[in-house]
UniProtKB/Swiss-Prot annotation:
Residue sites binding ATP per the record: 27-31, 92, 125, 176-180, 207-212
Annotated Gene Ontology cellular component terms: extracellular space
NCBIfam families, per the entry: PRK01059.1-4, PRK01059.1-5
Family from the record: Belongs to the ATP:guanido phosphotransferase family.
Top-level taxon: Bacteria
Record carries keyword Kinase: yes
Intervals of motif RDXXRA motif of the pArg binding pocket involved in allosteric regulation: 337-342
Biological processes, Gene Ontology terms: phosphocreatine biosynthetic process
Protein name per its UniProtKB record: Protein-arginine kinase
Catalysed reactions listed for this entry: L-arginyl-[protein] + ATP = N(omega)-phospho-L-arginyl-[protein] + ADP + H(+)
Function: Catalyzes the specific phosphorylation of arginine residues in a large number of proteins. Is part of the bacterial stress response system. Protein arginine phosphorylation has a physiologically important role and is involved in the regulation of many critical cellular processes, such as protein homeostasis, motility, competence, and stringent and stress responses, by regulating gene expression and protein activity.
Record GO terms (molecular function): ATP binding; creatine kinase activity; protein kinase activity
């Protein structure tokens, strides 16, 4: 696994495929929180204990293959620049919390769809990413990695409670399942607030694109379970999948309603956004995200021909501040970022059209 490859290829291999319901569901993620019995929680550990966990993983798991996942490499946060850490966050390979830790690290698969974060809130957090609605498949992969690690270490586990975690809401299965979902129809019809209220009453959480505390840029929301105690992994997945399928139906109905009642207004909105993307010389990340959302909707509804939906997904990643600066070879001021973002979008759309 090459750090240069990770940094220079903004689109992870797992993002290039189209999973089920990929017109609305961008990705599915499974995260398993685990702690080692012999160490204090990450929030209480000292430097020596953190280094011991690094060495344990370096000895037991680095450059070793498991199943069809290929070999894993280790990235230590204190060996990366702030910009490199930001790129990993923008590619959803690590959490913002891990990026801010001194003794954190990440075990990463060649395909980048599996990462094992070390010394975050818990000793390890296994993350599996799949395109589209593939929660069961992601859980299966996460369990394979979990079993692989558990052969070499002893987890903190209680027979009555389950896996012991730093945060009480993760005690039990330690499972956090989440789905990244694009909901422009519900936003445009002003139904999104009511939908979010219903989701929250069902015990689920709605966040922005980078998880807790982040903003829902480009009409993209992250829906996940909240409690992990008292339910099996399969039940958690089934409940979340059921809710997501209902949201998908609500989004499709909202899109149909807009087409029926406001078709010309929607078409105008889509093409105005396309015009901004295709012609702007300066564009901020929030405006780019909103315009990309409009154009993606236009592609899904058949207004715009000859442009792949995947290009929009690619541009959503490529135009993030960290990745833009990585491509530029170093830090950029806000206006320089806006200029490069606009240039990149124009060039990419021009290539796609031709």
């Amino acid at each position: 696994m090459s750090l240069d490859k990770i940094m220079n290829e903004a689109i992870s291999p797992w993002m290039k495929g189209d999973g089920p319901d990929s017109d609305i569901v961008l990705s599915s993620r499974i995260r398993l929180a685990r702690n080692f019995k012999q160490y204090q929680f990450s929030t209480m550990q000292n430097e020596e204990e953190a280094k011991q966990i690094h060495e344990l993983f370096k000895k037991k798991f680095i450059n070793k293959a498991v199943g069809s996942f290929g070999e894993f490499g280790l990235l230590k946060m204190n060996e990366l620049t702030p910009l490199q850490r930001r790129v990993l966050v923008e590619k959803h390979l690590i959490s913002p919390n891990l990026a801010g830790t001194e003794y954190g690290a990440c075990l990463l698969s060649e395909s980048e769809h599996i990462s094992v974060m070390l010394n975050e809130e818990d000793h390890i957090r296994i993350q599996c990413l799949f395109s589209g609605l593939q929660l069961s498949e992601a859980l299966q992969s996460a369990n394979q990695i979990d079993n692989w690690i558990e052969k070499e270490v002893e987890y903190a586990f209680d027979e009555s409670l389950g896996y012991i975690t730093s945060c009480p809401t993760n005690v039990g299965t330690g499972l956090r399942a989440s789905v990244m979902i694009h909901l422009p129809g519900l936003v445009l019809t002003k139904r999104i607030s009511r939908i979010i209220q219903v989701i929250q009453k069902l015990g689920l959480v709605v966040r922005g694109i980078y998880g807790e505390g982040s903003e829902a840029l480009g009409n993209i929301f992250q829906v996940s379970n909240q409690m992990t105690l008292g339910k099996s992994e399969e039940d958690i997945i089934a409940d979340l999948k059921s809710v997501i399928q209902q949201i998908i139906q609500q989004e499709k109905m909202a899109r149909e309603l807009i087409v029926q009642n406001s078709s010309i207004e929607l078409e105008d909105k889509v093409y105005r956004s396309y015009g901004i993307l295709a012609n702007s010389r300066l564009i901020q990340s929030a405006e780019a995200a909103n315009c990309l959302s409009d154009v993606r909707l236009g592609i899904d509804l058949g207004y715009i021909k000859g442009i792949s939906r995947n290009i929009l997904t690619e541009l959503m990643v490529l135009t993030q501040p960290g990745i833009l600066q990585q491509y530029a070879g170093g830090p950029l001021g806000p206006e320089e970022r806006d200029y490069r973002r606009a240039t990149l979008i124009r060039e990419r759309l021009s290539i796609e059209k031709n």
